[in-house]
Amino acid sequence: MDEDDGLLLNFAAPSSSEPTGNKAKKSGNKVTGGRWKDRRKLQLSLQGRGRNQKKEKIVATGVNSTDIDNSRLDRAKESLDTAKEKPAQEKRRVPTNQDHLGPSSKRIKFKETSGEFGGKNSSYVSSLFTSNEASSTLTPTDTSAATTTYLPSNAPLKDATTFDGLGLNDKLATHLTESLRFKAPTKVQRSVIPSLIATQRDLFVKAQTGSGKTLSFLLPIFHKLMSEEKYKITRESGLFAIILVPTRELCTQIYGVLETLVRCHHHIVPGIVIGGEKKKSEKARLRKGVNILVATPGRLADHMENTTSLDVSQLRWLILDEGDRLTELGFEETITKITDNISKNSKISETIHKYQGLPTERVNVLCSATIQDNVKKLGNMILNNPETISVDSNKQIEGTLNFDDEEEQNNFDSNNSEGKRMSAPDQLIQKILVVPPKLRLVALSAMLKKLSKETNSLDDGVNRRTIVFFSCSDSLNFHFDVFTRNGNMFKKRKNRETDKFETVEVPYYSKYDNEDDNEEDKPSILTAPILGSNSCVYKLHGSLSQQQRATTLQAFIKEKNEGKNSAKHSILFCTDVASRGLDLPNISSVIEYDPPFSVEDHLHRIGRSARVGNEGSAVLFLLPGNEEGYVDGKIRVVHPKEDNLRIISYEDVLKEGFAEPEEDQEEKKASTKPDPKKRFGKWDIHATTWHLDVERWLLEDSTAHDRAVQAFTSHIRAYATHLSTERSFFNVKLLHLGHLAKSFGLRETPKKLGKSVGGNTGLQDVNNSKKIKKEDPRKKMLRMAKMAINSNSSEFNY
């Protein structure tokens, strides 16, 4: 003690249970349960990082080792204790990828190392089966009960009426029944043919699509021309009939019907002039002489101004088919110019005594599926005191009236399905598929796979066909690329053994690396191995060249495809260019992937199926929410047979398309009850894998990705063009753009996609490593030449 300096040191040794130093701050007590705010406050308090912690926290020495002010900490602990006593259902669910301190950001980012646009560049991989809006008003229809089978409303008549009984030429009637295999006339043919043969009065024909309107006005013209015996009608006699139609495809189809009819009388010569073809060739055909001319309004007006060999002085019939579509495309002024030119140059009075069996004045015929205001305006311009013939499938109305008589017209409208609407065929089954936006692509794939399986299971040798309608050509091109990946193209090659040309499948290698490739250089017919071994996809829209459109349509119409591996299931991706008037054989199904822009467009689309008494089905894709009201607001009115309007579940469609064949059998054999919490089976894994393959393909191929972005933006623009009367169902402001972009295989945010398309840097900043290739001067010259040729055509490119 003597050596002691008098100082006494008091050391407070910490207990072994208490953490020391920074370890205490880092490890701390793990806090679980309760509100996030309370958990955060408690965690910070335990780490010594609370608000005003230095001022409020006073550490005592000696026996008192607790904080003086612990009121906030105690309140936080009490709130946690009460939260733990609440039932599990009321607890807030925390995603597995988050720690207990809460999310680090507003959205969860997933890193993708295999793709160019993955990882940090605003790329998000969302699940297909989460955050999907459920259907609120429409419930799936129970199809287990027996359904009523309705008789076809547009089938040929099965009574004693025949083509001979309608007053047609015996030779022509025999050709129809024996060579062309027409058994009996349809309702509209029974009403129109006698009227055109017996009278010279202008005519307005209203009938549903697929009812045989084309033959109803072609047969009387042929009958009259064939009946001239004293002065036989030849190509030198002149032009006697002009048929105006809105689209080139319908022109080609009517011309094909004319070619089959002239086989019984070779002296009559048909002709065709349409936009996209060479004017020089058309002028040569007109110079040789034609008796019946099928044309589009723009090209016909062009020839009337510039082709002197086109003589319309002897014109006896002017037929306007699809009058409602002619007015929608803005051809009123062109048609007025055509009719004025015909009236100005008419010289019928000079040949009345020569052709005594032909009309003494021009007969105008207007065919339309509806009597809308614009159609009435067109009728008032070209028709003179016309007779109206209408065939209503619902009330069996077959009558005539004065077109200009408002009182008679109003009475007719009230009896004839409100006069302004046509109806779907009675035998057509209309299905409504309400599918969330993220699942649109996989739902379409599942439906096409199902149809391919059904077609392949049938060994009757009949080629089934399906039509899928899109709202714009950009979306069509993207989906065509998706479903024809790794597909083969068809080429004709000479067989060395037989010395004949055969159609064979050749692997098609996509040229996406060449950014200067023109759309016309790519094939419009490819096989679809991802849908089935015997599936083939065609594309048809107005941006293709006329040669491609004609070749594609002709290949699709063929009864049997040539080649060893002929496609049994043919699928046509098209816009509304193929919705009017085209008579395509064996169309078993019509899929409206994008909603129509009007009810009339819907009826024309589904009218490609269930034609002339045949069975058919149609599927309309709708989004949950406001679009469901479109069924009761617009669709149900034009489908009078309620049993044939059915709501189907998208889960059932996905199961049928992606489920393995053994799964259904295992579920039936299983004796145990299924787990109610397990909503999905293996089919959802297959669907997710299929969709992820599409996304990875877009990440690996920059040009394909750009086409997907263009398709997405074009789809949104097309969606915004719905009629104002239907804006309550199709409101672009209510779309979930992020989920909709998912259906195009895109992982970027819609805002970033909009910047890339709008001309800003956008995605280009992400892909700085790739340099844009300079266009080859030779290819640029050829492309500019093609643009110049196309610009010379005055035909509306629809």
UniProtKB/Swiss-Prot annotation:
Residue span of motif DEAD box: 321-324
Name of protein: ATP-dependent RNA helicase DBP7
Remarks, miscellaneous: Present with 1460 molecules/cell in log phase SD medium.
Domain remarks in the Swiss-Prot or TrEMBL record: The Q motif is unique to and characteristic of the DEAD box family of RNA helicases and controls ATP binding and hydrolysis.
Organism this protein belongs to: Debaryomyces hansenii (strain ATCC 36239 / CBS 767 / BCRC 21394 / JCM 1990 / NBRC 0083 / IGC 2968) (Yeast)
EC number(s) from the headed UniProt entry: 3.6.4.13
Compartmental location: Nucleus, Nucleolus
Gene: DBP7
InterPro entries: DEAD/DEAH_box_helicase_dom (IPR011545), Helicase_ATP-bd (IPR014001), Helicase_C-like (IPR001650), P-loop_NTPase (IPR027417), RNA_helicase_DEAD_Q_motif (IPR014014), SPB4-like_CTE (IPR025313)
GO biological process: endonucleolytic cleavage in ITS1 upstream of 5.8S rRNA from tricistronic rRNA transcript (SSU-rRNA, 5.8S rRNA, LSU-rRNA)
The Helicase ATP-binding domain, residue ranges: 194-389
Binding site for ATP: 207-214
Keyword tags: ATP-binding, Helicase, Hydrolase, Nucleotide-binding, Nucleus, Ribosome biogenesis, RNA-binding, rRNA processing
